[in-house]
Amino acid sequence: LHAAADPTGWWNLYRFRADSGGDAAGGRDGDAALPTAGDAEALRETSAAFGVPMWTLGVSTFAFLGDGRIATLVTEGGDPSLRLLDPETGDLVDPGLPYSSFRPASIRSDGDRVAFVGHRTDAPSAVVAWRPEADDGGPRRLRESTDDALDPAYVSEPESVTFPTGDAVGADDATAYGHYYPPHNPDAEAPADAAPPLLVRVHGGPTSRSEASLSSTVQFWTTRGVGVLAVNYRGSTGYGRAFREALKGEWGVRDVLDCVNAARYAADEGFADPDRLAISGGSAGGFAVLAALAFHDTFDAGASYYGVADLRALAAETHKFESRYLDGLVGPLPEAADVYEARSPVAHAEGVTAPLLLLQGGEDEVVPPAQAEAMIDALVANETPYAYVEFPEERHGFRDADNVARAHAAELAFYGAAFDFDPAGSVADLELLVGERPE
């Protein structure tokens, strides 16, 4: 049995050998005993991740070739690649495939070929087949995710960012990471003496991560003159167990501080206008948006997609799969009830002074619409400018292409209203409300 495990603090690949017979490890008489940690043999110990969070069915970060080698995902320094591991020698070879992300993490092999979904920073994602030993031109892109033509002249490619952070605004006793996509449009020219607005994008999970890849959402902003900084806050995966577990008991604190410090870093380094800083995210990322606006004054606007406003209500109402997730991220109830209250943005909505856009799926069972409704009530009571867009048939994460386009148009119109500019092109008819509920 082969599996990824992290006794050293990194998800490395291990081989588990089961003893024959006996029941010491749970096997029945006459059956092979189940392998235990004591049977584990590291194929290669290294400060890199060979595993990912098992959020969905079908996840497989490695596959066996006919000659015994293992094609495996390896995330080093936050950047994933597909490599070849010799389980007998521990040799790990990087063939230099031109892919920067592999999502979903589903590596498959028939012994001769390796199949995966590969993402690049300059081309759409694709289903890829690769013969490691064949001299036939390299990986074959069997099917791309879109048939639309892509003009590379408009593509903004990311730059890796490492910035100081910690348990306070402006602290520098910890480190977080991200990918910065600069504004890029060959048909437009920005003022030479002005830094661009910045959109900090916050991934969900929270134990997920942002990876460098071509994203139509990111390019939507960069072609319109907005820089995008996708943050990998403490708690993100791909940086080892210590970084991942830094969010245990600290959700709503350290992730938010890392986003705040990321924006401050961008402004201090001169690649973001300190007076035009926005933050956007969905699910756990939406929670970070609400908390960043409620507890900090760094951002000038925020867009929360199906974000968590009330932690205690989430613990009571979310779906079964994540029903105990908050025990580790925040603390067990009822013992940690005060912590839930202290970190819930809806309980501190008086701190939200920047304009806020809420986008919500009407059929969401993970973060139910009641979360957005409670936040609206608090914003109305405090006369905070906001806008609300509901998608009645959407669930957790918008799937319909027209709805995704509507959400982008609404967010663009929202920033136009918040930052007092007229967006180019087609935008949504959106009005900021103050002291009143949406019709």
Give the predicted meaning of each segment.
Residues 1-2, 70-71, 114:
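Hydrophobic beta-strand positions that form the internal "hydrophobic ladder"
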Residues 4-15, 45-56, 73-83, 118-126, ...:
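A flexible loop/linker signature enriched in serine peptidases of the S9 family
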Residues 6, 17-22, 26-59, 75, ...:
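Multi-bladed beta-propeller domains
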Residues 57, 64-67, 108-111:
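Residue-level detector of Asp-centered blade-edge/turn motifs that repeat once per structural unit
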Residues 61, 104-106, 126:
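Conserved beta-strand position repeated once per blade in WD40 beta-propeller domains
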Residues 145-276, 282, 309, 316-324:
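Cap/lid segment of the alpha/beta-hydrolase catalytic domain
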Residues 236-439:
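Active-site-proximal cap/loop segments of hydrolase catalytic domains
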